[in-house]
């Protein structure tokens, strides 16, 4: 939001919620996140996008990619394709005609194929130095109902495909992401090349570790909450906005902390005391003093 304010841009708050099986979205989280963003930024997001509500767009682009010969339906097992990829060899499915892949595509969407039986791949170059970029998977079959969208769709996009299409749809000019997602930039650039699009400017940040919390992830915290180890997302032992609010942190102090770190690819490790000092400084500056 700070960059949007500085350069008169707009903030797109997007829920990349197309994984129905491994990391299904929490229905309550949509409202929570919007509320927490408004608290932290001091304003609502300019645009709010739920990917699960925009499935027809992603499926249309996937079909267009297949028709144009830039993608195909792969029926190899994960193990079989791994072997082809490691040996820089094309799998048999790669030579399918567009009409053959479209027939399989229809079967995928009609629910006639089981999970894992087929995926849609972006056709790149199987001799690329980076194995992760070789004919990477864009969409897969998921029969597990979506917590919000239900069982309307049988084929769901993976994050790299979905977010790339949505960035284009929303006119995104700058992407700020963790440096661990550099391969996502490389994959999406190849996809954009297929469609004849210019890829947005990409900026990266390094990992920020707070000593007292150690290593943590959203999925790890969710697991600990579901197991009863933590008492919800506002548990004071968790590094969430909800918990920090309960501990008395102001939104401005958190913003000042992150702005102070700056946008750098360097990994940073700090004590919680550093974060607390920003909050204490604001409290001290606004405290009423009597002589």
Labelled PLM ranges:
Residues 9-13, 41-42, 164-172, 220-221, ...:
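Short acidic (Asp/Glu) and glycine-rich catalytic loops that position anionic groups and cofactors
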Residues 14-23, 47-56, 79, 176-177, ...:
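Conserved short loop/turn motifs at secondary-structure junctions
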Residues 234-291:
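Extended, domain-scale alpha-helical bundle/helix-rich regions
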Residues 50, 64-221, 229, 240, ...:
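Active-site cores that bind ATP or allylic diphosphates and position pyrophosphate for catalysis
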Residues 8-9, 42, 70, 197:
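Short glycine/serine/threonine/alanine-rich loop segments
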Residues 29-54, 61:
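A glycine-rich helix N-cap at a beta->alpha junction
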Residues 25, 29, 54-57, 154, ...:
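Secondary-structure capping and boundary motifs in well-ordered enzyme cores
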Residues 1-8:
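Histidine-anchored nucleotide/phosphate-binding helix
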